[in-house]
Regions:
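N-terminal nucleophile
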Residues: 1-140
Length: 140
């Protein structure tokens, strides 16, 4: 199970994640332009999973709701759809557009999307096809 969090550290927004898998992932750190936006992200070579930050300070971390599905993706050497979705989220220059990208393309798990001023939690509701979005107040 993966655990994600959003909070403040030294008066700056920060995102954290513990990525716990039943396998040893093959990970690369990639820095590239995505639709003209500079991004740096963690990339799981076997599953295409990605999480990272862009030049505008927009960051994304995500936790799969159904870990068993992720384990199957690794075992079968197939690709998870959320990797490309997260890279598309990171290709935006403002957090509102990034959240709209997440809503438009969907995500399979709970994620935090953050910029220097805001932290947003986003979670799909598969039973009704809707999304739960909340702007977090982390001033204290």
């Amino acid at each position: 199970m993966c655990i994600i969090g959003a909070g403040k550290y030294s008066n700056s927004n920060c995102l954290v994640k513990v990525r716990d898998r039943n396998y040893v992932p093959a990970i690369k750190i990639i820095r590239e332009l995505v639709n003209g936006v500079e991004v740096a992200y963690l990339y799981d070579i076997d599953t295409d999973w990605s999480e990272g930050v862009n030049e505008y300070g927009i960051g994304v971390v995500s936790s799969a709701l159904r870990v068993i599905d992720d384990e199957v993706v690794k075992k079968e050497k197939s690709r998870a759809d959320d990797g490309i979705r997260i890279r598309k989220i990171l290709a935006h220059d403002n957090v509102s557009c990034a959240v709209n990208e997440a809503v438009r393309n969907g995500m399979s798990g709970h994620c935090f999307i953050s910029d220097p001023n805001q932290n947003i939690t986003f979670e799909p509701q598969p039973e009704d096809g809707n999304h739960w979005i909340k702007f977090l107040d982390l001033k204290n």
